[in-house]
Structures are given as structure tokens and as C-alpha cells.
Amino acid sequence: MISVTTKDELRSLIQTELYYHGADADLNFIDVSQITDMSCLFKGLDIWNIKIDKWDVSNVTDMYCMFFMCEKFTADLSKWDVSKIIGITEMFTMAKKMTEELKPKFNNLRYVSLN
């Protein structure tokens, strides 16, 4: 397990893994439990079946545009603990393959626009 503490560290590691392992890389080895901001994290990346279902996102508060323009992206995120999230505007905009069953279950939101 590799621990990251900032969004910039995480994005850099993701880009490296995608370069070496392709758009369906297994990223579950990354400990993201200290990250609070995942806004625009995957924005525009050519990803489809990356493995991030085991990520501990329980401290994340912002997922704004996280998968924006990730048209082929599909992953089961339904078990993510998103209880601290307050912003997800355009989180799945243009992520056409993501179904409601695969999306996290949001309850306490201030800014909502999943698209």
C-alpha cells in the first residue's frame, strides 16, 4: 500500500500507473484515506475499468468534476463511504457508462449536479 496525502501526489501516481498499466489499471493499492479534495482528479483521462472500489474516501469532502469527460469510465463505487461529501457538481458529467447502481450513495449534499 502506498499512502498519499495530497491530490497532486495522487494524480501524479495515477498518471504513472495509467502510463504503465493502461486505462484499466488496478489502483486499489493506493491509500487515499488522508485526501479531502478529489475534485477534477480523473477529469478528461481516458479511463474505463480502473479499480478504485476499495479506496477509503471517507475523509473526502469535494468530488467536483472528479470523472468529468471520462466517457468510457465504469466502476462499482456503490460501497464508497461518501458521508462527508458536500460537493459533487458535475462529478459524472459525460461519464456516459456510469449507471445509478454503480454510483456512490450520496445523502448529505449541498451542491448537487451529477449529470
Q: Which residues does each PLM region occupy?
A:
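Negatively charged
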Residues: M1-N115
